[in-house]
Amino acid sequence: MEDGYGINLVPLASFAIETYANDPCQCFRVHAQEDSDLREVSLNMKMHKAIAIIQFKLEGQVIKRRPEFNMDKRLLLDKIDYEEGTIMIEGKKYELLDKSFPTIDPNNPYELSEAEEALMNRLCMNFLNCDKLQEHIRFLFNKGGLYLCYNSNLLYHGCVPLDEKGNFRKVKIGSKQYSGKELYDVLEYYARKGYYEQDNREEHCLLYTSDAADEGL
């Protein structure tokens, strides 16, 4: 991000160093060259953990606001016993590999800390004010799409929801259900509406579109 778009990640680095100073963050290892500077690798792991925890919190807030997304299984921070260092999933208790969560309030695990809130405000401003990044995003929306028929081939983003028999599975969005091409059309409609109109509901649908692709809906 810094080399390609000139986006300042120093605020994230500073936050990570201060918050996880004595945490090796081994569970958040990132791909690195064999000859990489160990100090840089260590910093990258701290930054990875810092932004990952923030991501889990913000995703949780959206899921709680939009129960129709049916993504409650992604709500994990409230399933953790922070004193024991365990998590309860589908009635079974598992020990966590990483037990250090200094920014999580066990009574309100999806709320950003003041420092996290300030960090995200700065990062959002940096991303929104990056002319080069915004130019590339506009290009993607102007020229791209969720699917394309090209050279007798169907190219599509993410994955197509299917049922056990291999037929298109219906997915509920709003008050209606969609499947196959119709599903992709409505997701693209909301993605474009969210980008061009900057409406909060469609903005959250952009996150849903991304998560849905990851989950296979």
Enumerate the language-model features and the residues they cover.
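Feature recognizes metal-dependent phosphohydrolase scaffolds
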Residues: 1-212
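N-terminal low-complexity segments that are often proline-rich with Ser/Thr-Pro
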Residues: 216-217
